[in-house]
Amino acid sequence: MSDLLVFPGGGRLPVKDDRDLGHLLPRSAAGDLPDKAYQHWRAPPALDQGKSSTCVGHGCHQLLRASPVRNVKNIPDPYQIYNEAQKIDEWPGENYDGTSVRAGVKYLAKQGYISSYKWAFDGPTAVNHILTVSPVVIGVDWREGQMSVDGKGFIYPKGRMIGGHCVLVVGANTQEKCPDGNIGSVTLLNSWGPKWGNKGRAKLSMKAFDELIRANGEAAAVFETLKPQEAPVVS
């Protein structure tokens, strides 16, 4: 099992800074979601971060390779993204494990892969972006109930707090009935290898997704660009 990202300074996720490229997305109420009920973006096979704390690097790397804008040639590997993110994140030095989603997407923007990024502070706002624009990179609390996937393909933010973790949210289905009775789910692409969950993926109810983001989570809604050296890949 891969190590979780443990954030410096007590394990809390950093406050979003909307002074650079990042700004707040307009909030979307659950009733304001688009008529489109389902979207699942194509993504590469799940990576495995091993025993490292490089989930931000892996999540951001998988974002680059996922549709709708798929940068697949000469892109920075997960460890390069992680190392560069540590240099520009909220904490001094680099002698610690982990970094922030903010630093990861900020590095991708500096490299020209992202034209802008905005922050979603709740589940419906993030889901709206997933349904209409692209996957979302999140950094959220991770509990015992999220360590393994049940028979229905779901994880649950219950039990003892383990730490913080970054994953890529590649899909949303506003009409799926979840095992806990809630309606609506999102699909996460983890970086614990293809043997975890459903080929490295798991589902989370939209209710739980909303609670995780509101609990001081990071949800980066990005607007990607295709690097000049890239040949477009049909999604």
Predicted segments, located by residue:
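Catalytic-core signature of thiol
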Residues: M1-S235
